[in-house]
Amino acid sequence: MFDTVIEMLSYPFMTRAFLVGSLVALCSALLGVSLVLKRYSMIGDGLSHVGFGAMAIAAAMNAAPLTIAIPVVIVAAILLLLISGNAKIKGDAAIALISTTSLAVGVMVISLTTGMNTDVYNYMFGSILAMSAEDVKLSLVLSVFVLILFIVFYHKIFAITFDETFARATGVKAGVYNTLIAVLTAVTIVLGMRMMGALLISSLIIFPALTSMRVCRTFKSVIINAAVISVVCLIAGVTLSYVAATPAGASVVLANLVMMVLYTVVGAVKNHMR
């Protein structure tokens, strides 16, 4: 086992996968708790489809994928908030509207230009080989930026997560912080797409939060446990991907599923013993 770990870390692409993956998993878990509690967890799925469309366009233009995808997905996240604020269009409908349109654009661009090549396949399903050195540098900077902003505005995010109406009454600018959460989520989604894939990246937002809630009862404990679960499952999934030659995204999701089953059993036992 130890020899396998040494062998994995001897490859630069594995070191990049563990480093960036852990940071993205950490950011996803922190944001995921608020998104799940606000019943807005599927925003990750919607934005990942937007990211796929943006990366397809970047591939057709031979441009750097992250530099194209990040601003496009941020705009889409803000647009989602504006549309969902319209009483005539609910949040889930807004997500479906934007995500399906973006996916259609991506598929059309691919069919008219490059076709289903390896890069596009990696964007959809993820690959531990997909992270370049430039991607790592940008991902490190942006991940640290996301973490710092979340920590700095933790109390405001806590307030709008549990009672947005009361938060507004106490002077908290809920719209600003909702936008902040959406923008941070957009950046995190794009950073994780290269490894997890557009079809599976939303699992990093949903699984750790729901798993932690099986056992934990306070906001802080849920966040801490979700962060630990997310990073542990990411490392386990990437390791499985290397050993078994399976897609990284699928391996991480399965690791999260196993962890959720374990936490559900532990939670049921704790409730039974009370």
Task: Name what the model sees in each region.
Residues 2-16, 87, 95-155:
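Transmembrane helix-bundle core of multi-pass membrane transporters
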Residues 4-9, 124, 128-129, 229-266:
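C-terminal binding/interaction regions
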Residues 17-20, 66-73, 92-96, 140, ...:
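Loop-to-transmembrane alpha-helix initiation sites
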Residues 22, 26-30, 71-79, 105, ...:
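Generic alpha-helical transmembrane segments of integral inner-membrane proteins
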Residues 33-116, 212-224, 241-244, 267-269:
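Short loop segments and helix-boundary regions at transmembrane helix junctions
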Residues 136-208:
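Helix-loop-helix "hairpin" substructures at the membrane interface of multi-pass membrane proteins
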Residues 155-156, 265-274:
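Membrane-interface capping segments at transmembrane-helix boundaries
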Residues 201-250:
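Transmembrane alpha-helical segments in multi-pass inner-membrane proteins
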